[in-house]
Amino acid sequence: MAPKAEKKPAAKKPAEEEPAAEKAEKAPAGKKPKAEKRLPAGKGEKGSGEGKKAGRKKGKKSVETYKIYIFKVLKQVHPDIGISSKAMSIMNSFINDIFEKLAGESAKLARYNKKPTITSREIQTAVRLVLPGELAKHAVSEGTKAVTKFTSS
């Protein structure tokens, strides 16, 4: 039985090698067009470096968040209180939503007045339209104060 066991693996190895050889012949033919497509896009050695950088850029995709600023304001108002990551995410989404609404309203106002530029006046009017009552008044006063501080420095 031992000789038969030896013959079967020996018989299988050449059989496996032949399809592998056929696959090896077919695979390079299939890979050559792909390699040709990659070379013009990657441009040789520089392409491999760019591929790595592009990979890094995708990994380090910069996402603008307001988490730092939310945390700073929280510590100004309540120094002893923390915030969970879920609550922080909700606050970040809230701020993004408000800014989107303000930007959209400001753009509409600029279009209505046939002006190509959104100025502080459009922003101020958008704040009055989007935010309710006292909140709008406080936002306008804080915004005016911030703009004055920025222009004076």
Curated annotation (Swiss-Prot):
Q: Which UniProt keywords apply?
A: Acetylation, Chromosome, DNA-binding, Isopeptide bond, Nucleosome core, Nucleus, Ubl conjugation
Against PROSITE patterns, the record matches this protein to:
HISTONE_H2B
GO cellular component terms? nucleosome; nucleus
Which regions are flagged for Basic and acidic residues bias?
1-28, 36-53
Q: Main site of residence?
A: nucleus
Keyword Lipoprotein set for record? no
Annotated region (Disordered) at 1-60
The cross-link Glycyl lysine isopeptide (Lys-Gly) (interchain with G-Cter in ubiquitin): at which residues? Answer: 149
Q: Does the keyword Disulfide bond apply?
A: no
Please state where this protein is localized. Answer: Nucleus; Chromosome
Question: Which GO terms of the molecular function aspect are on file?
Answer: DNA binding; protein heterodimerization activity; structural constituent of chromatin
Which of the residues bear the PTM N6-acetyllysine?
7, 37
Task: Tell me what PTMs the record reports for this protein.
Answer: Can be acetylated to form H2BK6ac and H2BK33ac.
InterPro entries given for it? Histone-fold, Histone_H2A/H2B/H3, Histone_H2B, HISTONE_H2B_site
**Which positions make up the signal peptide?**
none
Q: Which family does it belong to?
A: Belongs to the histone H2B family.
Kindly give the PANTHER family that the UniProt entry links to this protein. Answer: HISTONE H2B
Subunit structure, interactors included: The nucleosome is a histone octamer containing two molecules each of H2A, H2B, H3 and H4 assembled in one H3-H4 heterotetramer and two H2A-H2B heterodimers. The octamer wraps approximately 147 bp of DNA.
What is its biological role?
Core component of nucleosome. Nucleosomes wrap and compact DNA into chromatin, limiting DNA accessibility to the cellular machineries which require DNA as a template. Histones thereby play a central role in transcription regulation, DNA repair, DNA replication and chromosomal stability. DNA accessibility is regulated via a complex set of post-translational modifications of histones, also called histone code, and nucleosome remodeling.
* Name of the featured protein: Histone H2B.6
Which species expresses this protein natively?
Oryza sativa subsp. indica (Rice)
